[in-house]
Amino acid sequence: MTKHDEVARRQRRNFLRTAGGAALGLVATKDAHGQSEHAKAASQGTRRRDEPSDRGLWATWYDLPDTGRDAYLSWLHETYLPALLKRPGYLWAAHYATQNTETRSDLHHVEDPKVPTGFRYVLLIGAKDAGVFGNPAPVEIQAALPEQGRKMLAMRIGERVNLMTETSRCDGHAGNSHKEGPLGAPCIQIGSFNCPVEYEEEMLAGYVQVRLPAMCGAGSCVRTRKLNSAAGWAKHAILYEFASLEGFQRDYAVTNAHAPIGLKGHSVVPMLIHAPNGPNMATRIWPPVAKA
């Protein structure tokens, strides 16, 4: 081999090495803007800043007898809920007293006597996700309570439970001034219901495209959450959160009137089967609402 041939061979080898590196770089660039972006996000194991941290909701509706009510409320607020919030994945708890006591005659309510009818109190517990409520399950937590705690829970009348996962959320105008983070707002309206399967897609579209944006455009709305059930009678729920009772009374009905749950002006509400005595408008009794 001549000196000239050796130089030519070396130049060709360097060219192939450079070209190969460029090709690998091109492939890596393609992956970085395609599938590997998703892999990177997954491998980081961190939640996006705009993604809600409390996707799980444990909702309980119930009534209480007059006798022993104050003792029960003291136990719930001072003992049971603070202990519950020390568990991994549990983020917040809010206890509400229902303000509307008349059942709406324009809605279809379930007639099955097996579905509990409590509604005067609503207890909401937020968690990282609905899987938190599977280990341990609420029934396991409550069975492990000391005797006094089990006696307190036994005071609940018509108790109905749903364990839910959030499927859609809209943050409202009042969210910027809401200083309590994910904690349930001072005033809520919560509805739980079932829907014939042939209307479920339209219902979802109606909430996401129409109702949620409209409600979150109201001045007193903190946030609105559409939820689906992991356990419990109702397959669906909607949670509207407001900065105050006065704001709810001003904004809720007028907003609903112009935001039907459906497509092209159609409403699926007549097809829904609501939980007993629902939906429920309620104000928070714990944690206490700070005075303005």
Where are these regions (language model features)?
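Signal peptide processing junction and immediate N-terminal pro/mature segment
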Residues: 30-41
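Macromolecular interaction modules
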Residues: 40-292
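A ubiquitous, low-specificity "background" feature that marks scattered single residues
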Residues: 20, 36-37, 253
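Cleavable N-terminal signal peptides
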Residues: 21-22, 32
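Short alpha-helical interface patches
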Residues: 7, 28, 132-134
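N-terminal secretory signal peptides
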Residues: 1-14, 36
